[in-house]
C-alpha cells in the first residue's frame, strides 16, 4: 500500500518492536515471526559480541524458510562480497528515497533520434547503445553525498510544497521573501549582482554545501522550506556540457537556440560511455531540445 518504514538501523541491526511505530507494526508486521529475529545484526561483523563461529542471521532465515517449505533449495556458495575500505566490514545496502528524471517518457523519441547519428562502428549505436535505450529505466538523479552540485529543490516542513530554483537571481529573490517572513536574518548573497557573470561577482557567493543548506525559504502557504540534502548525479553535469560551457540559458542563447554551436559535429570516447557520457548527452538533448547532442561519433575500446 506504499506505507514503508526502515526495519534495520544504521548500525545494521534489526529494530526491536518497541522501536517501531506501533501502528505500522499492527498493520504490517508479523510480530510472532519478527520477534524471533528482532535486535539481531544483519551481519555478524557489526555486532562486537559475535564472532565468525556464531550463527548468522542469513543462515538462520534460510533454515527457517526451508523448514516451512518456503525455500526450494538452500546451499552455500563462495563468492565475492563488497567490504568497506575503511572498516573492512561487509557493505549493507539500504533502499533510499531518490529523485528521478522520467526518461522512460521519451524512450521512443530517444531511439528515433539515435538512428540519425552516424556511429562508428555502427554496431555500437545499433547494438550496445540501441539496446540500452530499448531497456531504458528512469534516471536516478540524486546522490546522497557531500561534495558536488546541490539539488536546487526546497521542500516545506510538511512535505506538500516544493520549489525548484532555476538561477542564482531567483534564489536571491526567494531569500528576500524568507527574510520578510522572518525565517532568515540576512541574505548571505547580499552584494551579488544578477546579470553580472564576472568571476569577481561569483566569487562573492558559494552555492555548495554546507552553506546552501543554511538557506531557509518560505512556501506559498507560509511554511519554512529546507533544501533537499542530496546532490545531482555528476553525469548530469557531463551531459549538460554543450550548454553549461556557454552558460546557457543566461548567455549565448543564440548559439544553442539557433544551433550555431550545437549539436556537436563529432565526439569520441570509449565504449564504456554507453551508459555514461553518450547516454546523458543524448538524454538531456532529447528532453530539452528534441535534438541529438552529436552528429558523428567514434566509440573505441
Task: Locate each region found by the language model.
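Conserved active-site neighborhood of enzyme catalytic/cofactor-binding cores
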Residues: 57, 115-120, 131-132, 136-138, ...
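Residue patterns forming the tRNA-binding/recognition surfaces of aminoacyl-tRNA synthetases
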Residues: 1-194, 207, 277-278
Amino acid at each position: 500500500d506504499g506505507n514503508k518504514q526502515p526495519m534495520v538501523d544504521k548500525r545494521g541491526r534489526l529494530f526491536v518492536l518497541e522501536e517501531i511505530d506501533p501502528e505500522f507494526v499492527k498493520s504490517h508486521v508479523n510480530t510472532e515471526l519478527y520477534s524471533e529475529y528482532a535486535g539481531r545484526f544483519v551481519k555478524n561483523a557489526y555486532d562486537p559480541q559475535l564472532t565468525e563461529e556464531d550463527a548468522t542471521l542469513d543462515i538462520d532465515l534460510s533454515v527457517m524458510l526451508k523448514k516451512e517449505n518456503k525455500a526450494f533449495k538452500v546451499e552455500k556458495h563462495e563468492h565475492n562480497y563488497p567490504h568497506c575500505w575503511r572498516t573492512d566490514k561487509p557493505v549493507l545496502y539500504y533502499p533510499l528515497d531518490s529523485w528521478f528524471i522520467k526518461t522512460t517518457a521519451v524512450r521512443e523519441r530517444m531511439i528515433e533520434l539515435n538512428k540519425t547519428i552516424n556511429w562508428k562502428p555502427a554496431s555500437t549505436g545499433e547494438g550496445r547503445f540501441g539496446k540500452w535505450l530499448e531497456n531504458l529505466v528512469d534516471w536516478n538523479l540524486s546522490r546522497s553525498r557531500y561534495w558536488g552540485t546541490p539539488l536546487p529543490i526546497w521542500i516545506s516542513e510538511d512535505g506538500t510544497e516544493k520549489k525548484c530554483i532555476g538561477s542564482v537571481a531567483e534564489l536571491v529573490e526567494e531569500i528576500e521573501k524568507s527574510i520578510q517572513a522572518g525565517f532568515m536574518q540576512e541574505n548571505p548573497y547580499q552584494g551579488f549582482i544578477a546579470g553580472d557573470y564576472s568571476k569577481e561577482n561569483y566569487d562573492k557567493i558559494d552555492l555548495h554545501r554546507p552553506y546552501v543548506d543554511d538557506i531557509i525559504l518560505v512556501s506559498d502557504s507560509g511554511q519554512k522550506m529546507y533544501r533537499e540534502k542530496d546532490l545531482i548525479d555528476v553525469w548530469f553535469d557531463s551531459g549538460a556540457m554543450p550548454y553549461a560551457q556557454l552558460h546557457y540559458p543566461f548567455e549565448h542563447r543564440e548559439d544553442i537556440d539557433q544551433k550555431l554551436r550545437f549539436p556537436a559535429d563529432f565526439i569520441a570516447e570509449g565504449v564504456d560511455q554507453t551508459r555514461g557520457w553518450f547516454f546523458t548527452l543524448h538524454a538531456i538533448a532529447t528532453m530539452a531540445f528534441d535534438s541529438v547532442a552529436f552528429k558523428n561519433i567514434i566509440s573505441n575500446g
